[in-house]
């Protein structure tokens, strides 16, 4: 039998084909994400917009396949508490209250089967053998105490090398669990910056891929949360914050908006954006969401080491904005002096944290003394 050697061009074609197959084999396929949109507290109307947007983001980018855990249908409607009108007699009001109490009892009975069905859904979705099939989980504006059957085991699953992605009200979820709040990064404590307002924001790392799509300073219309004292700056790398000087109201504390963190071998990405339908439909937000998901899945390299000094500096700038507004000071001049000190010694603002935190517990009319102490530190020479 006669054999012919391959020509040079044929060898080249074969080599290219082999390399292409090798590269294709090295490229990871779409991840599998469990996307949870169940709420046991307030339910955001924008969830109905978020669900198809998330499915589309994963599919069009080849990044992930979304398996949804949605609200079961058929839940009975809870009764609304009566509001006493001015001309309502005591007798009529007592009757209204009694009727409401009876309606509540009936709702509890009617709601019990629905609650049981919800628990069974979570028991199935969060069983160890089910979680083992996922690369991560998304909490998209979840609220309340979700019936996760074994929360410590779920958190350990994330630590084992999985992704957790939280949108908007993910921080208004499972607030009774310190461990969950520590993982996600914060626990909702109000939203003075409402959904109808346009607020100012600052990007701390314009080159970070999770926030590179935003200008360094910009305005955005969405509802913005503040967080309770369990928030730990030493755990998080905050990439985007509320710019207090460009927002109303001006409160004397730092308001982080988007962050990343390592969690054991796992990765956490959280963004507070997502209350409004318009946010979910915005191309810039979609890039932000996709980049955060890609980072959490380990599909892109980007720093995640905590940046408490950056956060402390932004905290001080927020205090300066609020103090200047309250006392009629020159906010720009004060901020320039504070920034000059921070530039010389990045740890200086972090050293003021105990004083700054004390302001959080003061009502506006009781802050003047602490404002004066902070301004004195800024004006103090020699540093």
Regions found by a protein language model. Give the residues of each.
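Structural recognition of the beta-strand scaffold that forms the well-ordered cores
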Residues: 34-36, 66-68, 135-140, 163-168, ...
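Extracellular ligand-binding/catalytic regions of CAZymes and related secreted enzymes
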Residues: 25-31, 37, 45-48, 52-61, ...
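Catalytic beta-strand/loop cores that center a nucleophilic Ser/Cys/Thr
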Residues: 101, 121-122, 133, 186, ...
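A glycine-rich, often tryptophan-bearing local segment used as a flexible ligand/cofactor-contacting loop or short
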Residues: 130, 136-139, 143-216
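Sec/Tat signal peptide C-region and signal peptidase I cleavage site
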Residues: 21-23
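Solvent-exposed loop/turn segments at secondary-structure junctions
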Residues: 39-43, 72-75, 142-146, 164, ...
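Bacterial N-terminal signal peptides
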Residues: 9-19
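Bacterial N-terminal signal peptides that target proteins for export
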Residues: 1-11
């Amino acid at each position: 039998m006669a054999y012919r050697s391959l020509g040079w061009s044929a060898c080249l074609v074969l080599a290219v084909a082999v390399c292409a197959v090798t590269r294709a084999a090295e490229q990871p396929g779409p991840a599998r994400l469990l996307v949870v949109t169940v709420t046991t507290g307030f339910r955001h109307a924008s969830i109905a917009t978020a669900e198809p947007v998330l499915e589309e983001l994963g599919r069009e980018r080849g990044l992930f396949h979304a398996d949804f855990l949605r609200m079961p249908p058929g839940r009975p409607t809870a009764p609304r508490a009566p509001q006493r009108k001015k001309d309502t007699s005591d007798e009529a009001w007592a009757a209204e209250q009694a009727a409401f109490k009876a309606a509540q009892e009936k709702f509890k009975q009617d709601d019990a089967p629905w609650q049981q069905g919800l628990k069974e859904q979570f028991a199935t979705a969060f069983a160890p053998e089910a979680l083992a099939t996922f690369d991560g989980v998304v909490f998209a504006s979840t609220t309340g105490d979700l019936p996760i059957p074994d929360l410590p085991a779920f958190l350990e699953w994330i630590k084992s090398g999985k992704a957790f992605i939280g949108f908007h009200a993910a921080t208004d979820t499972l607030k009774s669990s310190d461990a969950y709040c520590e993982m996600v990064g914060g626990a909702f404590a109000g939203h003075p910056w409402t959904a109808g307002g346009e607020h100012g924001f600052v990007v701390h790392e314009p080159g970070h891929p999770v926030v590179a799509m935003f200008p360094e300073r910009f305005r955005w219309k969405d509802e913005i949360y503040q967080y309770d004292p369990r928030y730990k700056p030493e755990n998080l790398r905050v990439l985007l914050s509320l710019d207090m000087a460009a927002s109303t109201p001006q409160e004397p504390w730092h308001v982080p908006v988007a962050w990343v963190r390592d969690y054991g071998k796992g990765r956490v990405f959280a963004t507070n954006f997502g209350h409004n339908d318009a946010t979910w439909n915005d191309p810039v937000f979609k890039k932000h969401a996709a980049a955060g998901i890609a980072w959490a899945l380990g599909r892109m390299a980007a720093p995640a080491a905590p940046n408490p000094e950056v956060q402390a500096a932004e905290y001080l700038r927020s205090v300066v904005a609020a103090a200047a507004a309250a006392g009629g000071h020159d906010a720009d001049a004060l901020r320039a002096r504070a920034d000059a000190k921070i530039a010389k010694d990045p740890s200086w603002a972090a050293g003021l944290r105990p004083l700054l935190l004390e302001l959080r517990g003061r009502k506006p009319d009781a802050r003047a003394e602490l404002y004066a102490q902070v301004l004195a530190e800024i004006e103090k020479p020699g540093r």
